[in-house]
């Protein structure tokens, strides 16, 4: 096999997107985890302007793909299972880093990814934990907001407040904290979005002070829930708002019949990890971020999110 790498590509053709989507499915079936997170899917679909792409082809067959997100400073890449260990991932990684020195995601912490990281002289800089909560039908969850706050559902005129609270809650989070109103609308345009599942906490004046954006999607005909984003205005942190919103979302998703609820959280965020553990969640897998041992001076290696840290 003598693949040819094409790139950087600013805008993918429809055929390219279809072939890469087929590659994603093949890698997911083989590895048990998708090589792209939600942000990566948005980039593949052309819903963002910050992604650059590289494609490895053997003849007409797509055997590898990489994308770099200039806004999040991250790289995601994949190689078709039959084409692995032939230098394709190394070539794609080096091509992407020449343009965007970045952190590279390894979803599921696959052994092959660890080997490649070592070969390229990369170090582990982040761990993103996937936690899960089984949903027995008799599991009680009550939501009790602090005095002066009330639980409500998102309204269209809440969008600016939602974005502002999200930014404040994730101010040290270049990915989640950078969510714009347009980003939020893109997420709300997805098939799974249900306005009833975007729960908010308001003060007595009606101001939004926190939110729990839940997600329910079918997996092989079985509904599965997710704590998609949980954010609280910093002025209300430590008052039980995050836990109350978490419980309200769990109750909402339980009523929809989900079999389990998942979430993603930074491994370094011990306070929030402990909150989720107290609610019954446990770690089921780990995503790892790798970066050059000597990061580029302009690169921000602060706390970032993947497909997104869901924080409280």
Swiss-Prot record:
Pfam families: Acetyltransf_1, Acetyltransf_7. It catalyses: 1D-myo-inositol 2-(L-cysteinylamino)-2-deoxy-alpha-D-glucopyranoside + acetyl-CoA = mycothiol + CoA + H(+). Acetyl-CoA 2 binds at residues 230-232, 237-243, 269-274. InterPro entries: Acyl_CoA_acyltransferase, Bact_Acetyltransf, GNAT_dom, Mycothiol_AcTrfase. The keyword Glycoprotein does not apply. Keywords: Acyltransferase, Repeat, Transferase. Its EC number is 2.3.1.189. Residues 297-312 have a biased composition (Basic and acidic residues). Coiled coil: none annotated. One of its GO terms (molecular function) is mycothiol synthase activity. HAMAP family: MshD (MF_01698). Catalyzes the transfer of acetyl from acetyl-CoA to desacetylmycothiol (Cys-GlcN-Ins) to form mycothiol. Belongs to the acetyltransferase family. MshD subfamily. Monomer. This is Mycothiol acetyltransferase. The lineage of its organism: Bacteria, Bacillati, Actinomycetota, Actinomycetes, Propionibacteriales.
């Amino acid at each position: 096999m003598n693949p040819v790498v094409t790139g950087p590509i600013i805008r993918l053709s429809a055929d390219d997107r279809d072939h890469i989507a087929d590659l994603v499915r093949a890698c997911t079936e083989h590895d048990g985890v998708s090589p792209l997170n939600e942000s990566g899917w948005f980039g593949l679909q052309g819903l963002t302007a910050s992604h650059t792409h590289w494609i490895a082809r053997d003849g007409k067959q797509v055997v590898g793909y990489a994308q770099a997100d200039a806004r999040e400073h991250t790289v995601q890449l994949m190689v078709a299972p039959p084409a692995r260990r032939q230098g394709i991932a190394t070539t794609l990684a080096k091509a992407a880093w020449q343009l965007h020195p970045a952190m590279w995601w390894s979803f599921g912490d696959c052994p092959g990814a660890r080997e490649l990281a070592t070969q390229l002289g990369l170090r582990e800089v982040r761990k993103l934990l996937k936690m899960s909560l089984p949903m027995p039908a008799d599991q009680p969850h009550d939501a009790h907001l602090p005095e002066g706050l009330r639980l409500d559902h998102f309204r269209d005129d809440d969008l600016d407040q939602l974005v502002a609270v999200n930014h404040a809650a994730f101010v040290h989070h270049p990915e989640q904290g950078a969510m714009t109103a347009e980003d939020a609308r893109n997420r709300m345009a997805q098939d799974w979005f249900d306005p009833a599942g975007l729960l908010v906490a308001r003060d007595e004046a009606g101001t939004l002070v926190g939110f729990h954006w839940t997600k329910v999607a079918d997996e092989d005909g079985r509904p599965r829930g997710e704590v998609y984003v949980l954010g609280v205005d910093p002025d209300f942190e430590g008052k039980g708002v995050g836990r109350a919103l978490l419980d309200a979302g769990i109750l909402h998703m339980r009523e929809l019949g989900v079999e389990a609820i998942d979430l993603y959280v930074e491994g370094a965020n011990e306070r929030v990890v402990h909150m989720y553990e107290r609610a019954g969640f446990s770690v089921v897998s780990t995503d790892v971020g790798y970066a050059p041992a000597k990061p580029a001076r302009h690169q921000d290696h602060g706390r970032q999110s993947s497909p997104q840290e869901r924080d409280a």
